Structure formats: C-alpha cells, structure tokens
C-alpha cells in the first residue's frame, strides 16, 4: 500500500505516518526532513526556514530519488509533505508510471485554522532524530532525547499564515487531480486527539488491505 498524506501544516501528518507504517508495512518518506538534510544553497535553506516553497524541480528530484530507492528494494511508502503544488502532483503521477507503482489512497487531514495555530506554536523538533512533538512533553517520544527546540518555520505567526495560504491555494486542485485518476480520497477529522485520529485512520485503511 502506497499512501499520500495531505493536509495543512500542523494537521498531524507526520505523527500519523509514523503510526501507520507499523501496520501497512511501508516506509515513511518525510519530504520536509529530506529537504532539510539535502545539500541546499544558503538561499534555499533560508527560504525553507521562512516557510516558502522550494523550486518544484528541486523537490521533485529529491523525492524521485528516494522513491526509486524504495521501489528498487520492494518497499511500499507513505508520502508526507509531497506533493505541495500542482506541478509536483503531476510529477508524482509521472513517477508512478516511470517507477511502476500505484498510489492506493490520498489521506486528507482536515483541521481548523485555530487548532493549527495552537499546535504549531506549541511543538518542538528533536535535534537528535528530527521527530516533532508537543512542547509539554519535554522529551522526544521517538528516541528519548531531551535536546529539543522549536522549528524555525513554527516561530512566527506570519510564517504560519504564509504556510496556510500556500496550502489553501492548491488544496482543491490537488484533491481533484487525485480524484481524476480514480484514486480514493480519504478525509479524516484531524482536530481530535492523536489516539482518536489514529484509531479512525487504522479502521479505514485496514479496509484496503
């Protein structure tokens, strides 16, 4: 099963991806993390920190190589943070033909803007493994490290607004493109607790297996 996790920043895509991979036997492809460790220019790094979208060709290239690696060894994948533009969406469909894989489902996370602001202004990123978690935890739930800090693109309200605006500008077009390919779009109420969302998602996804 190959999944695409789609939703605004702070909607819980990464958190749910890490849970899903255990029962659908798939590797999580965190596009944001891939780009943060890629050999970016100084300008590109600053744009990423400012919440701006990087050039489509750069993002597509990074994702294509990662998917190529996974497909080569027979792994399924969960895409988190890609596609984020119509161009990237078309590129993903081209990759599916080129690398011979099928996209099982687009999981669309729906959550209010108010909740998104609350989450993004109250989360940390682990300096050791890159996992995201709530600030109240104080310790990384993935590796146990206490070396955590706020992600640079979560620091300012203006940056969060920009990220939400970028998502809103392409949300409908991307969803419609998946539907035009007869790919199921699964809408999830992501405004609930992590466990509630996980349970609902598990129930619905297991219907595919």
UniProtKB/Swiss-Prot annotation:
<keyword id="KW-0545">Nucleotide biosynthesis</keyword>
<feature type="binding site">
    <location>
        <begin position="52"/>
        <end position="54"/>
    </location>
    <ligand>
        <name>AMP</name>
    </ligand>
</feature>
<dbReference type="GO" id="GO:0046872">
    <property type="term" value="F:metal ion binding"/>
</dbReference>
<dbReference type="InterPro" id="IPR027417">
    <property type="entry name" value="P-loop_NTPase"/>
</dbReference>
<feature type="binding site">
    <location>
        <position position="36"/>
    </location>
    <ligand>
        <name>AMP</name>
    </ligand>
</feature>
<feature type="binding site">
    <location>
        <position position="163"/>
    </location>
    <ligand>
        <name>AMP</name>
    </ligand>
</feature>
<comment type="function">
    <text>Catalyzes the reversible transfer of the terminal phosphate group between ATP and AMP. Plays an important role in cellular energy homeostasis and in adenine nucleotide metabolism.</text>
</comment>
<feature type="binding site">
    <location>
        <position position="143"/>
    </location>
    <ligand>
        <name>Zn(2+)</name>
    </ligand>
</feature>
<feature type="binding site">
    <location>
        <begin position="81"/>
        <end position="84"/>
    </location>
    <ligand>
        <name>AMP</name>
    </ligand>
</feature>
<feature type="binding site">
    <location>
        <position position="140"/>
    </location>
    <ligand>
        <name>Zn(2+)</name>
    </ligand>
</feature>
<dbReference type="InterPro" id="IPR033690">
    <property type="entry name" value="Adenylat_kinase_CS"/>
</dbReference>
<feature type="binding site">
    <location>
        <position position="126"/>
    </location>
    <ligand>
        <name>Zn(2+)</name>
    </ligand>
</feature>
<keyword id="KW-0067">ATP-binding</keyword>
<dbReference type="Pfam" id="PF00406">
    <property type="entry name" value="ADK"/>
</dbReference>
<comment type="similarity">
    <text>Belongs to the adenylate kinase family.</text>
</comment>
<dbReference type="GO" id="GO:0004017">
    <property type="term" value="F:adenylate kinase activity"/>
</dbReference>
<keyword id="KW-0862">Zinc</keyword>
<feature type="region of interest" description="NMP">
    <location>
        <begin position="30"/>
        <end position="54"/>
    </location>
</feature>
<comment type="subunit">
    <text>Monomer.</text>
</comment>
<keyword id="KW-0963">Cytoplasm</keyword>
<feature type="binding site">
    <location>
        <position position="123"/>
    </location>
    <ligand>
        <name>ATP</name>
    </ligand>
</feature>
<keyword id="KW-0547">Nucleotide-binding</keyword>
<feature type="binding site">
    <location>
        <position position="88"/>
    </location>
    <ligand>
        <name>AMP</name>
    </ligand>
</feature>
<feature type="binding site">
    <location>
        <position position="129"/>
    </location>
    <ligand>
        <name>Zn(2+)</name>
    </ligand>
</feature>
<dbReference type="GO" id="GO:0005737">
    <property type="term" value="C:cytoplasm"/>
</dbReference>
<dbReference type="InterPro" id="IPR000850">
    <property type="entry name" value="Adenylat/UMP-CMP_kin"/>
</dbReference>
<feature type="region of interest" description="LID">
    <location>
        <begin position="122"/>
        <end position="154"/>
    </location>
</feature>
<comment type="pathway">
    <text>Purine metabolism; AMP biosynthesis via salvage pathway; AMP from ADP: step 1/1.</text>
</comment>
<keyword id="KW-0479">Metal-binding</keyword>
<keyword id="KW-0418">Kinase</keyword>
<keyword id="KW-0808">Transferase</keyword>
<feature type="binding site">
    <location>
        <position position="151"/>
    </location>
    <ligand>
        <name>AMP</name>
    </ligand>
</feature>
<feature type="binding site">
    <location>
        <position position="192"/>
    </location>
    <ligand>
        <name>ATP</name>
    </ligand>
</feature>
<dbReference type="GO" id="GO:0005524">
    <property type="term" value="F:ATP binding"/>
</dbReference>
<dbReference type="GO" id="GO:0044209">
    <property type="term" value="P:AMP salvage"/>
</dbReference>
<feature type="binding site">
    <location>
        <begin position="10"/>
        <end position="15"/>
    </location>
    <ligand>
        <name>ATP</name>
    </ligand>
</feature>
<protein>
    <recommendedName>
        <fullName>Adenylate kinase</fullName>
        <ecNumber>2.7.4.3</ecNumber>
    </recommendedName>
</protein>
């Amino acid at each position: 099963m190959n999944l695409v996790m789609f939703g605004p920043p702070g909607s819980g895509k990464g958190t749910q991806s890490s849970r899903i991979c255990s029962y659908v036997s798939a590797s999580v492809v965190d596009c944001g993390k891939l780009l943060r460790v890629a050999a970016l220019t100084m300008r590109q790094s600053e744009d990423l920190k400012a919440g701006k979208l990087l050039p489509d060709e750069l993002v597509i290239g990074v994702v294509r190589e990662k998917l190529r690696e996974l497909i080569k060894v027979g792994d399924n994948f969960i895409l988190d943070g890609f596609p984020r533009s119509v161009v990237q969406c078309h590129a993903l469909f081209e990759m599916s033909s080129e690398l011979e894989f099928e996209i099982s489902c687009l999981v669309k996370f729906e959550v209010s803007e108010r909740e998104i602001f609350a989450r993004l202004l109250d989360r940390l990123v682990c300096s050791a493994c890159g996992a995201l978690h709530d600030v109240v935890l104080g310790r990384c739930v993935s590796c146990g490290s206490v070396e955590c800090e706020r992600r640079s693109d979560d620091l300012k309200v203006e940056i969060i607004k920009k990220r939400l605006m970028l998502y809103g500008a392409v949300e409908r077009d991307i969803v419609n493109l998946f539907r035009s390919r007869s790919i199921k779009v699964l809408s999830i109420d992501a405004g609930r607790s992590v466990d509630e969302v996980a349970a609902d998602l598990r129930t619905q996804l297991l219907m595919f297996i």
